[in-house]
Each structure stands twice: as structure tokens, then as C-alpha cells.
Amino acid sequence: GCVLLPWC
């Protein structure tokens, strides 16, 4: 999962 990218 992504942490810094809200659109991931």
C-alpha cells in the first residue's frame, strides 16, 4: 500500500 500518495 501507499503512505505518501493518497491516490494509490
Swiss-Prot record:
Subcellular location: Secreted
Residue positions, PTM D-leucine: 4
Entry comment describing in which tissues the protein is expressed: Expressed by the venom duct.
GO CC, any one term: extracellular region
Protein keywords: D-amino acid, Disulfide bond, Ion channel impairing toxin, Neurotoxin, Secreted, Toxin
GO molecular function: ion channel regulator activity; toxin activity
Protein family (similarity comment): Belongs to the O2 superfamily. Contryphan family.
Summary of the function given for this chain in its UniProt record: Its target is unknown, but this toxin may modulate voltage-activated calcium channels (Cav) or calcium-dependent potassium channels (KCa).
Notes concerning its domains: The cysteine framework is C-C.
Protein name per UniProt: Leu-contryphan-P
